[in-house]
Amino acid sequence: MYRYKITIEYLGTHFAGWQRQAGVLSVQQILEEAIYKFSSEQVTLFGSGRTDAGVHAIGQVAHFDLSKYLEPYKIIKAINYFVRPYDVGVWNCELVSNNFHARFSAISRHYIYRIINRTYPSVIDFNRAWWISSPLDILAMQKAAAYLLGKHDFTSFRSSSCQSKSPIKTLTEINIIKEYEEIKLYISAPSFLHYMVRNIVGSLVLVGKNIWQAEQIKNVLDARDRKIAGPTAPAFGLYFIKAEY
């Protein structure tokens, strides 16, 4: 068998998420069907992260196996031909060892959350960034974010449906910058809990609005109680940037 690693970008707006589900459109389904159309092989695509409905990706990584060898550049062209009706595309493909696994071989995952912070909404970024009209205090958000760096119990920031066995995660990066009217939150970790990034962003926005003091983030973290954390930020502002191996 030949194992291929592909790097994918997609707009999550019209997808029910990455993972194949009965009765709804998923990124995994569209790609698996495209691969079948040119290879005549039923494959299972394994992704580095299972993005939720509405979440976008710039560098999602996945792998699949084929029984016959095909040039990687031909795979890129073939997949992109068959996924043309959808907001998804492959921009890299390479042959990898059969020991490689897109999910389990990953040592770090990187996300960015985009906020448009101005008095009027953005037409261009509709469904691609969270619009917040009230000014956000970036310095306060940065101070609050520092409490989340490192290894912690992130129970307060996981969804009620999270299936992870442990709430202990290690944030290796949480960087907040402002570029003109856009605020970008860069968040990295080896792995995440379900809704963890969006729940963190929702809480940091409360700090940015001066509803919370920065120190409240530490109180929320220590409480290990989802009910006292902030709201879940909208899915459409979140982007899976890359996985590292």
From Swiss-Prot:
Homodimer. SUPFAM superfamilies: Pseudouridine synthase (SSF55120). The active site is at 52 (nucleophile). GO terms for biological process: tRNA pseudouridine synthesis. This is tRNA pseudouridine synthase A. Formation of pseudouridine at positions 38, 39 and 40 in the anticodon stem and loop of transfer RNAs. InterPro entries: PsdUridine_synth_cat_dom_sf, PsdUridine_synth_TruA, PsdUridine_synth_TruA_a/b_dom, PsdUridine_synth_TruA_C, TruA/RsuA/RluB/E/F_N. Keywords: Isomerase, tRNA processing.
